[in-house]
Amino acid sequence: MKKILIGLCLIPLFSIGQTTDEVLKELKKQDVKFPKIVLAQSILETGWYDCKDCSLDKNNLFGLWNSKKHEYFYYTNWKESIGGYKRGIQYRYLKKEYKDYYHFLSEIGYATDPHYIIKLKKIFNKL
C-alpha cells in the first residue's frame, strides 16, 4: 500500500510542463554544474518523468544506484536526489579537468548504454 501512495503522490508533481522548469530551478539553486545537461539526464533517466519501472518511485531523478545494497538510492523527495547527484557524481568532476561535461559522463561510466550521450544531447537540444 505504501508504494502505491508514493506513486500517486508523484503523479501531480511530475507533470511535464512545470516539472522541467522546477527541476532546472532547483538544480541552479543547489549550484549543480551544467544544470541544463543534468536536467536532460533527469529527463532521460525517467522517461520525461513518466517511467513506470524506474527509480522515480524512490524520488530518484537520476537512476542513482546503491551498489552495496543492489538497489536504487531512496530519497525523501526529488530535491534530495539533486543533492545526491551533486555529492555522488559532480564531486568527481571537480577533482580533474575535463574537456566538457559529456566527456566527463562518458569517462566515469555514468551509463551502460553506449548511446547515452547521443540520447542526452538530443534531449538537451529540445530544451
Language model features: what each stretch is:
Residues 1-2, 91:
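Generic cytosolic/nucleocytoplasmic N-terminal low-complexity/intrinsically disordered segments
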Residues 3-15:
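Sec-dependent N-terminal signal peptides
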